[in-house]
Amino acid sequence: MILLKLYLTLAAILCQSRGMTSLDLDDLMTTNPEIQNEIINKHNDLRRTVDPPAKNMLKMSWDNIIAESAKRAALRCNYKEHTSIAERTIGGVVCGENYFMSSNPRTWSSSIQSWFDERNNFMFGFGPTIPGVMVGHYTQVVWYKSYKVGCAINLCPAQSLKYFQVCQYCPGGNVAGRKYEPYTIGEPCAARPKDCDNGLCTNPCAYNDDYTSCPDLTKQVGCHHPVTANC
């Protein structure tokens, strides 16, 4: 059965935090390879710590094309104007998106950690433990098959929350039908123990979850078999 995919564009709105005022916008530009490494390392470090553990969590890597897409989203300066699915479709793959806004610049590690900390109100397989609380940033950060990421920041001086950080993830997570199961529970790398880097799988397959059976089909016949053409 084909499921309608629900790719959530998510925004975290946080006010000024202490200890962040020494940063400058230039310190956070994602054209800097050091910043790219910080973003990737932070995501991968957090993905290794999910509880319950994940047997199929992919290792993330940086993608400049996705970063350019995230930059276009950041230039809008308005989290209410969500990036359309068409604009977030890169190479035929629909990507997910997380937003973060703040009154003062924050390190990328801090912003990503804030998304991840939504897990404090999340129960695997159930969803939010408090009605209405946001958990979609967390589930996107730890979505098992989102293995490419690109991020950007923009200064929006007309707004009180003027620092606008955007990350896009490909393939996107938060898929309808399993958005509260962002990965499969099991021993780290148990899905592909020969393709493993410290608990993260290194055998990505860029397919969309158009069918509930896509993960099993892809495992059996690979990414390029006609059976998985619509995965």
UniProtKB/Swiss-Prot annotation:
Domain SCP: 41-169
Cystine crosslinks: 77-156, 95-170, 151-167, 189-196, 214-231
Domain ShKT: start-end pairs: 205-231
Signal sequence coordinates: 1-19
Residue stretches in coiled coil: none
Keywords associated with the record: Calcium channel impairing toxin, Disulfide bond, Ion channel impairing toxin, Neurotoxin, Potassium channel impairing toxin, Secreted, Signal, Toxin
Posttranslational modification: Contains 8 disulfide bonds.
Tissue specificity: Expressed by the venom gland.
CC terms in the record's Gene Ontology section: extracellular region
Protein's job: Blocks ryanodine receptors, and potassium channels.
Name of the protein described by the UniProt record: Cysteine-rich venom protein VAR10
